UniProtKB/Swiss-Prot annotation:
Quaternary structure, from the entry: NDH-1 is composed of 14 different subunits. Subunits NuoA, H, J, K, L, M, N constitute the membrane sector of the complex.
Catalysed reaction, written as an equation: a quinone + NADH + 5 H(+)(in) = a quinol + NAD(+) + 4 H(+)(out)
Keywords in alphabetical order: Cell inner membrane, Cell membrane, Membrane, NAD, Quinone, Translocase, Transmembrane, Transmembrane helix, Ubiquinone
GO-annotated cellular components: plasma membrane
Cellular localisation: Cell inner membrane
Functional note: NDH-1 shuttles electrons from NADH, via FMN and iron-sulfur (Fe-S) centers, to quinones in the respiratory chain. The immediate electron acceptor for the enzyme in this species is believed to be ubiquinone. Couples the redox reaction to proton translocation (for every two electrons transferred, four hydrogen ions are translocated across the cytoplasmic membrane), and thus conserves the redox energy in a proton gradient. This subunit may bind ubiquinone.
Family the entry assigns: Belongs to the complex I subunit 1 family.
InterPro entries (alphabetical): NADH_UbQ_OxRdtase_su1/FPO (IPR001694), NADH_UbQ_OxRdtase_su1_CS (IPR018086)
Bilayer topology term: Multi-pass membrane protein
Broadest EC class assigned to this enzyme: translocase
GO biological process assignments: aerobic respiration
Organism: Nitrobacter hamburgensis (strain DSM 10229 / NCIMB 13809 / X14)
Top-level taxon: Bacteria
Gene: nuoH
UniProt name for this protein: NADH-quinone oxidoreductase subunit H
Length: 356
């Protein structure tokens, strides 16, 4: 037995595989529980803006409402439309949900708290968010109905339009941090930035990129809303107008998987906002008692702050028309983000403050 545990097969392959699977399962459980309460927070925030209580029946203060909704969806019978492509129809929500969950493999919630700390973390996130379009197109095409298909095409056009702007946002952060590794980007906001330049390195929040890259932070925030089909850019679903968009033929567990994938993608974008612009797990002030708080708590607070901005946009901003949405993406955000890339690169080069 001792020889087996000392063998290269165990030490180099099997044991790291077991650890990675255990980490993945733990992350999945924590993430799903967090999604349940983020969904509840979304409904509570929306209710508070409209001066009502929101979910308050299931459990104390409605805390178990999301689990009751889960049970309701699971117990319903899935109905597959006649004439639809059954395999693709059932595969589409699974693709959407799995891709959304896969993005969390590279997101660090604290120092060294990440499943796979790859050196191209931003590129991986960008690729995963691009692949999510396939699940939507598969759902629209396989439903054998013109309405889901048209909604899927609208969604694909919308997501592609705003991925360009998000790509330029990533490039800007890459220029400032000098790395595609998400952990390295967070550490760069600890050692370099405005606070360090003015001689106050302990004011960590001045080192974060939200201040020098404020226009790009706004572009990222609005583009993330459009990328995840959130109000005021929920033209694909538009609850009060189009019923359910490309999900109109779905019900039961497949519909639940689509909703789960949507909220996981929203949480991923919130996490990326916290990492790229708010210092990830870093405290706002690198002095006691702030640096006594575990980094995962700071990361969670920043993530929830980003989600609060998402929820407030849903509650107070009216829905855009489709032509307004496309005009904003191609005629405003694309030139602005491209200009910011050039400006940031020029400032870093001529001020000789580019990362070495």
């Amino acid at each position: 037995m001792a020889e087996f545990f000392a063998a290269p097969f165990w030490t180099d392959f099997l044991w790291p595989l077991i650890v990675m699977v255990a980490q993945s399962v733990l992350l999945l459980v924590v993430l799903l529980i967090a999604i349940a309460y983020i969904l509840l927070a979304d409904r509570k925030i929306w209710a508070a803006v409209q001066i009502r209580r929101g979910p308050n029946v299931v459990g104390p203060w409605g805390l178990l409402q999301s689990f009751a909704d889960l049970l309701k969806f699971v117990l319903k019978e899935p109905i597959i439309p006649s004439g639809s492509n059954k395999g693709v129809f059932l595969l589409a929500p699974l693709v959407t949900c799995v891709l959304a969950l896969a993005a969390w493999a590279v997101i660090p919630v604290n120092l060294n708290w990440v499943i796979s700390d790859i050196n191209v973390g931003i590129l991986y996130i960008f690729a995963i968010s691009s692949l999510s379009i396939y699940g939507i197109i598969m759902a629209g095409w396989s439903s054998n109905s013109k309405y889901p298909f048209l909604a899927a095409l609208r969604s694909a056009a919308q997501m592609v339009s705003y991925e360009v702007s998000i790509g330029f946002v990533f490039i800007t952060v890459l220029l400032c941090a000098g790395s595609l590794n998400l952990s390295a980007i967070v550490e760069a906001q600890h050692v370099r930035g405005l606070g360090s330049l003015i001689g106050l390195p302990w004011l960590t929040f001045l080192n974060w990129y939200w201040l020098p890259l404020l226009p790009m932070f706004v572009v990222f925030y609005v583009s993330a809303l459009a990328e995840t089909n959130r109000p005021p850019f929920d033209l694909v679903e538009a609850e009060s107008e189009l019923v359910a968009g490309f999900m109109v033929e779905y019900g039961s567990t497949p519909y639940l998987l689509f909703m789960l994938g949507e909220y996981v993608a929203i949480t991923t974008m919130c996490a990326m906002g916290a990492i790229l612009f708010m210092g990830g797990w870093l405290p706002p002030i690198d002095l006691p008692p702030f640096n006594w708080v575990p980094g995962v708590i700071w990361f969670s607070l920043k993530l929830f702050f980003m989600f609060f901005l998402f929820a407030m946009a849903k509650a107070i901003v009216p829905r855009y028309r489709y032509d307004q949405l496309m005009r904003l993406g191609w005629k405003v955000f694309l030139p602005l983000s491209l200009a910011m890339v050039v400006i940031v690169a020029g400032v870093l080069q001529f001020a000789d403050i580019a990362p070495k």
